[in-house]
Amino acid sequence: MAKTNRIKIKLISSSGSKHFYTTTKNKKNQINKLSLKKYDPIIKKHVIYQEKKI
């Protein structure tokens, strides 16, 4: 079987609300850490989520 190029990552809220999303990313194409603006349902606002490994 072929080795997968995708790794699981956790996107953690920068607001400190302990909310997170999980997703995968291609480790060969995306070398830098991922940072996305997503909705945080705990504080009911859009905030920046930053990548951490699972």
From Swiss-Prot:
GO molecular function (one): structural constituent of ribosome
Protein name as it appears in the record: Large ribosomal subunit protein bL33
Family, similarity comment: Belongs to the bacterial ribosomal protein bL33 family.
Matches recorded under SUPFAM superfamilies: Zn-binding ribosomal proteins
Superkingdom of this protein's organism: Bacteria
Source species: Buchnera aphidicola subsp. Cinara cedri (strain Cc)
Pfam families xref list: Ribosomal_L33 (PF00471)
Gene behind this protein: rpmG
GO cellular component: cytosolic large ribosomal subunit
Taxonomy of the source species: Bacteria, Pseudomonadati, Pseudomonadota, Gammaproteobacteria, Enterobacterales
Swiss-Prot/TrEMBL keywords: Ribonucleoprotein, Ribosomal protein
Gene3D superfamilies documented for this protein: Ribosomal protein L33
GO biological process per UniProt: translation
